[in-house]
Regions:
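Conserved alpha/beta enzyme-core scaffold
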Residues: 1-492
């Protein structure tokens, strides 16, 4: 069906990509990310550097790609600029050293910013596809991300045709691209499982300059075995949601959930699945991870909408082997739709995300360790946190065996403000911040979420801090962080 295009090896296709090109990769997490071109681009960079020639690309993605892909590009010094999110230890190190420029963005806004031309032209898009048609129809795989926008905006397109994927994966896709202001229509999604688009992206077939065949699974990893800390946080989340149902603030049929990625979120999903008082529910999220597949099988989750399937190869094979069951229960959308503020607000999504650090007034830091070193990025947490019906942030109360408190007087970096964070939950308890003044919020967070070994310090800070509506002692507000830098422990 796609024989009209030039077949190339990955190394041959990498020759198309020139120094300083803006390159856009498909995928959202490892799902749907290119498998062959990252290594080939790294190889080309090494060859050019050995020849004393400059070679670096500027790299746009949907969210993260596989850490291995970012690692190999980083090791080859092949990237000069990166956006909007990453999870690679090697790339993270270079970003924090200033060797790579990084732009941390709300994921729902990336496609729009590209369409507005804020980043310049996309020279080459590298897109994983499950199938092509001669008229330029491109069927994507397990991670939609920003691939539709990349396909439409790029000057040249390299397709990685991945034969690993079942052709029926296209049945999961719902591709719709919003118009441009001031004539942008509403997105007519009124139910988590509504479909409003097509199963493919239509582009000018002349833009496709190479097709590289692969047969490789996504690099999805099984998460670590649950620990007691994660399980206690999950229990507290379920307790809170049941209380909300009892008070009539969550309807009997429940509300759609958004859940981030990681061990805490996986534990929460497992506990929701086990609790008989939680009714079957839907998800309107950005990522579907391992636990969701099981809950779809059992019927606890009746339908799930997201931008990617970030799951193990075994779970993906289970879906492919049972597409008659799963095709009507999973929808994969572009991230400007999965993370769309209009839809999140309309559906009344309950957002469950993890933070690095919270201050006593309810601000949250989810990106920068000690305020300076990037961890991964804000990702989609801000899209959901700002617009959700209930915005819940979760974290352990301490890290590094108590040397670090997650609750501090003032966040060293703020990603989510006190005006949007509604609930904070640690293994210690639940801080419901709705309707509370700043000082009430502070006492609630300290009493319910801070670890006992830090509560006295935080209460003393609050009592001694001068102020009016908000109390802060700017001479001592970062003493915990200073102690950590000086001694390796916040308590010194």
């Amino acid at each position: 069906m796609e024989t009209q295009w030039t077949r190339m090896t990955a190394n041959e296709a990498a020759e198309i990509i020139q120094h300083n090109d803006m390159v856009a990769f498909s995928g959202f997490t490892p799902a749907g990310s290119p498998k062959a071109l990252p290594t080939a681009i790294a190889r080309r960079a090494n060859e050019q550097h050995e020849a004393k020639k400059p070679y670096q690309i500027r790299l746009l993605t949907g969210a993260s790609i596989s850490a291995a892909a970012d690692d190999v590009l980083s090791d080859a010094d092949a990237v000069s600029w990166r956006a909007p999110y990453q999870t690679s230890s090697g790339l993270r190190k270079k970003i924090n050293q200033g060797a790579v420029s990084f732009v941390d963005l709300h994921l729902s806004e990336v496609a729009q910013m590209v369409n507005y031309g804020f980043f310049g032209d996309i020279d080459v898009a590298v897109i994983e596809a499950s199938a092509l048609a001669p008229d330029g129809q491109v069927w994507l795989t397990c991670g939609i991300g920003n691939a539709p926008t990349w396909l439409l905006r790029a000057k040249k397109v390299i397709i990685e045709l991945n034969n690993y994927h079942d052709p029926r994966v296209a049945e999961l896709a719902d591709i719709v691209i919003p118009g441009a202001p001031p004539r942008r229509n509403s997105v007519s999604i009124f139910h988590a499982m509504d479909r409003v688009g097509t199963r493919y992206v239509q582009i000018d077939p002349k833009k496709i300059v190479a097709v590289v065949e692969t047969n490789l699974p996504d690099a999805g990893n099984m998460l670590d075995k649950q620990n007691p800390m994660c399980q206690q946080i999950a229990d507290n989340v379920v307790t809170f949601l049941l209380q909300e149902m009892a008070h009539g603030r969550i309807p009997p049929e429940f509300l759609p959930l958004q859940s981030g990625v990681g061990n805490i979120n996986n534990a929460v999903m497992a506990r929701l699945g086990e609790n008989p008082e939680i009714p079957p529910f839907m998800m309107y999220s950005e990522v579907l991870q391992e636990s969701v597949v099981h809950l779809l099988e059992t019927g606890k989750i009746s339908g799930a909408s997201a931008s990617s399937l970030t799951i193990s190869a075994d779970s993906l094979r289970k879906i492919y082997d049972n597409m008659d069951y799963f095709a009507s229960r999973i929808v994969l959308r572009p991230q400007e739709i999965s993370n769309n503020p209009e839809i999140i607000r309309r559906l009344g999504v309950i957002a469950l995300n993890v933070g690095l650090e919270f201050d006593i007034y309810g601000h949250a830091n989810s990106t920068h360790v000690a305020g300076v070193d990037l961890m991964n990025g804000i990702g989609g947490s801000g899209d959901f946190e700002r617009n959700a019906y209930l915005s819940i942030f979760m974290a352990p109360s301490i890290a590094k065996e108590g040397k670090i408190s997650t609750v501090v007087p003032m966040c060293s970096h703020v990603d989510h403000s006190e005006h949007s964070v509604k609930v904070i939950i640690t293994e210690q308890g639940i801080a419901d911040l709705r309707g509370l003044s700043p000082l009430q919020r502070a006492r609630t967070i300290i009493d319910n979420c801070a670890h006992p070994m830090y509560r006295d310090y935080l209460h003393r800070y609050l009592e001694n801090a001068p102020g009016g509506h908000i109390h802060h002692d700017l001479s001592h507000v970062f003493d915990l962080h200073r102690n950590l830098i000086a001694t390796g422990s916040m308590l010194g």
